[in-house]
Each structure stands twice: as structure tokens, then as C-alpha cells.
Amino acid sequence: MKAAITGYRGFIGKRLLSLCDLSIGIGEEYTKEELYRSLNEFKPNVVFHIGACSDTLNTDVNYVLETNYIKTKWIADWCYVNNIKLIYASSAAIYGTDKNLPSNLYGWSKLLGEDYVINKGGIALRYFNVYGPGEEHKGKMASMIYQNIKKDKVKLFPNKPTRDFVFIDDVVSANMYALLNYDKLKGRWYEVGSGDSSTFEMIFDLLGIEYEYLDKSEIPNGYQMNTLSLTKNWMPGWKPKVNLEMGIKRYKKYLDEKS
């Protein structure tokens, strides 16, 4: 199986690249002509389209839409014309604050990309809050777990917002499952999460880190108070294997060994 992977230097893309026997990584900056030349020369059996602007607070409309939507269209069109499998990294950000529509530019860009991929017969995987080994380079876009795991005390938003934290191994397994079962899964979206909704307080209790609360006025506009993947929206036959307690333990061990 020959795989082309966009975002191959990133958190998820790098893991997928290591699993595929024959694969190429496609960088973040490319023209349509450069993209098509690379794909035509390599002739992949599948494209994992992971690369994106992942900054949920970015308000540069031209940049976000070019990166997350226009380039997705290029890839989806090439895969459609050449009858190549396409697995697209979507996001739970498309649910926004009211569970119906995105509440920021990032969410809208991912929804547009997802719709286009599905209409071309691809698979869209809506990732929830991914965490685990390998996200160190993401900086402010790394999970809250990584950003605070070495601190003695953290500041949290009030009202106990919740997240569906999903371990990186389960996200990788979801991509491989989608590939292996492509023909029966293609043409729609699926959620990739743990199926459990956890407060940030639960995270830091597991880590033994103290916390205090920010003022309610500091909660930004468009902030999702709750996210949760539903098992009915998972790929039939796929399920995550790493629960929160297990994932936190593994992640902490990994970071301790690196320091």
C-alpha cells in the first residue's frame, strides 16, 4: 500500500508516515501544480489528508480557507479523477457552541472541506481532543494536558467545561481502520473520540496538579463548553482502546522519560 500524507511532520501525520511501508510526505506549502506533480509521480493508493491550519483562533480568512478548504478541494478532485482512496482529518470544532454549526473560522473551514471530500466519495474523520506522545512541537495548539503537565498549579475556566479526550494511538487506529474498510465506509463522516466526557478537573486530579478558576468573563466567545463523540457516529466495528486514566499514565511516563 502506497500512502501520500499531508501534514506528515505533524502530530498525527508523523505517526501515520511511520506505519506505511511505502509513503511520501507532502509539505505544508505547495501549489496545485506541485501537488499534482508529486501525486502523479508517486501514484499512491491512498491519501491521508491531515495537513491544515489547526489554530482555532486564527481569523485570517484568506489563509485559513486557502489552507483548509481550497487545498482540500485540490486533493479531493485528484483522488476522485484517479479513483484513489481519500481519508480526511476533520474536527469536532464543526459542532460549535450550539452543536449545530461552527462558531469560528477554523470550524467552518473544516466543515467545508469535509463536505467536499464526502461529495467526492472520500471518508472524513471528525477528531475530538487528541492528546499523547508526539504533540510537543504544537506549541499553543498542543493539548491542555501537554501544556500544563509540568506545572504545580493551573488556571481553569469556571462551570466545568468537558472534553472528549482521545489518545493518539486510537486516532491512528481509526485511520488505518478506515483504510482497511474503505469500500463499505466511504462517502460519509465518522467521529473519532473516546466516548467519554471528562472535565479538566478530572485531568489534573489524575496528574496531582492543583487548580484554581479564572473569572467567567475570561471565557472567549465561541468557546465550546462540552464535546462528546457518540458511539452511533463511530465507524461500525471500530472502537477506542485507551481510556483517559490509561492514556494519562502512558503520556506522563513518556514525558518523564524524555525529560
Task: Spell out what each predicted region is.
Residues 103-107, 115-163, 168-172, 206-207:
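NAD(P)-dependent short-chain dehydrogenase/reductase
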Residues 63-74, 104, 108-109:
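Glycine-rich NAD(P)-binding loop of the Rossmann-fold in SDR/ketoreductase-type enzymes
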Residues 49, 73-105, 123:
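Conserved Rossmann-fold NAD(P)-dependent oxidoreductase catalytic core, especially the SDR/UDP-sugar
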Residues 35-67, 93-97:
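NAD(P)H-binding glycine-rich loop region in Rossmannoid oxidoreductase-like domains
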Residues 7, 150-259:
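C-terminal substrate-binding subdomain of Rossmann-fold SDR/epimerase-dehydratase oxidoreductases
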Residues 3-20:
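N-terminal Rossmann NAD(P)H-binding glycine-rich loop of SDR-like oxidoreductase domains
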